[in-house]
């Protein structure tokens, strides 16, 4: 038998690898068709590569109802699913995770099938205090609602993170969920939002323990994307231990920690601050400490050490983000949050900007935003959240005597 030359062997191996690789790729991408095609009632509008954590995101529309879908694949993350709905009383959202696409689908069928079909009773939860604050800062905004209203199909979003080979079954189920949902009028993001016209100072009571504290927020009207990027960078810098905010607050209110973040409603954005455990008598002192920290940032900027510390922390976060145990859920909820603001496809850019915050501190962009956007704004909300008593359960009619023996399971 004639022996093959070494060159021929290498050529055959190359062809084999190419063939297997191409077939594997084709099988993996076959679940989601090309842009403009449809699968299980969903039309593919756009597909983009994700720089971090890798993989792809496909943006689809349910042709029968207009519901939105984001399908994330090839990230290596554990399967996850988020379903969100915009209701007349704010946003409703739930996220499921699983070890496999099949398990995710089974869990979804058990717990999500009727989630948006009827009104849900509003109950106190961990976000109730924050929502109460947003109701004062951004009256009527979606994020201030509890999602108790009914969600129609036009106002729904599903975000799926799963292997492509599980896409067909999941999309088929979602097609049924959206098709069965009640028809209704499409709601624009923050349709009921009305901007405050003067400083607001309120005290609100929230049932339950651990909800007390003081919030202070500053609204930037008609904030463009560049303003929002700089506000996010400021929040990342100021919430760190040892920051200008941390020092000013602790000097004014010893043993008090403060956190900060950003929020938006309509065309407006805001930077907010929260100190848990403070009471109404501390509210103005907290507000003044926050403003003092902002004035210091506008005058002297941020130290080289603060910039270096933030840069190192964000670089580490960027490198480890693809290795997160909850990566699938984090991606799903990130896309859903961007959708709630008006555009799900904005999430990848938000991730990139989040990891660039230190650069905006170093070049003076954040100090400029403080001077031109925050310290000049008179639209503020100072809100004290006081823990209130839990509601007593409603009395129920006397129940009939229970049987002495439980019925056998069927």
Listing of model-derived features with the role each one plays in the protein:
Residues 19, 25-39, 156-164, 308-410:
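C-terminal regions of mature proteins
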Residues 71-76, 91-100, 155-163, 220-224, ...:
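Second-shell loop/turn segments in exported
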Residues 205-206, 212, 253-270, 280-290:
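A glycine-rich, aromatic-flanked flexible loop/lid motif
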């Amino acid at each position: 038998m004639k022996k093959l030359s070494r060159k021929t062997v290498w050529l055959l191996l190359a062809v084999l690898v190419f063939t297997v690789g191409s077939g594997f790729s084709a099988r993996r991408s076959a679940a989601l068709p090309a842009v403009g095609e449809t699968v299980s009632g969903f039309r593919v509008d756009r597909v983009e590569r994700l720089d971090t954590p890798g993989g792809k995101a496909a943006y689809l529309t349910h042709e029968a109802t207009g519901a939105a879908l984001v399908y994330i694949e090839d990230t290596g993350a554990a399967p996850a699913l988020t379903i969100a709905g915009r209701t007349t009383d704010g946003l409703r959202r739930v996220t499921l995770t699983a070890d496999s696409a099949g398990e995710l689908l089974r869990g979804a069928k058990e717990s999500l099938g009727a989630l948006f079909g009827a009104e849900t009773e509003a109950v106190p939860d961990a976000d109730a205090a924050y929502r109460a604050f947003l109701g004062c800062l951004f009256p009527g905004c979606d994020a201030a609602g509890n999602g108790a209203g009914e969600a129609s199909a036009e106002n729904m979003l599903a975000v799926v993170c799963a292997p492509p080979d599980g896409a067909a079954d999941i999309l088929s189920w979602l097609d049924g969920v959206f098709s069965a949902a009640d028809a209704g009028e499409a709601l624009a993001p923050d349709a009921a939002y009305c901007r405050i016209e003067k400083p607001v100072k309120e005290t609100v009571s929230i049932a339950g323990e651990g909800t007390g504290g003081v919030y202070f927020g500053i609204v930037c009207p008609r904030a463009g994307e560049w303003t929002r990027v700089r506000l996010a960078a400021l929040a990342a810098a100021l919430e760190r231990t040892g920051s200008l905010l941390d020092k000013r607050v602790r000097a004014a209110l010893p043993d008090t920690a403060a956190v900060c973040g950003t929020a938006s409603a309509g065309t407006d954005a805001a930077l907010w601050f929260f100190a848990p455990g403070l009471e109404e008598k501390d509210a103005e002192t907290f507000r003044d400490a926050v403003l003092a920290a902002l004035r210091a940032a506008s005058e002297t900027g941020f130290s080289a050490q603060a910039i270096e510390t933030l840069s190192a922390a964000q670089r580490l976060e960027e490198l480890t983000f693809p290795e997160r145990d909850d990566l699938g859920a984090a991606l799903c909820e990130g896309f859903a949050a961007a959708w709630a603001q008006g555009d799900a496809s904005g999430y990848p850019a938000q991730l990139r900007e989040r990891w660039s915050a230190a650069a905006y501190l170093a070049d003076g962009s954040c100090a400029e935003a403080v001077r031109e956007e925050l310290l000049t704004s008179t639209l503020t909300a100072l809100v004290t959240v006081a823990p209130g008593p839990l509601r007593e359960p409603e009395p129920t009619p006397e129940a009939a005597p229970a049987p002495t023996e439980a019925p056998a399971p069927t």
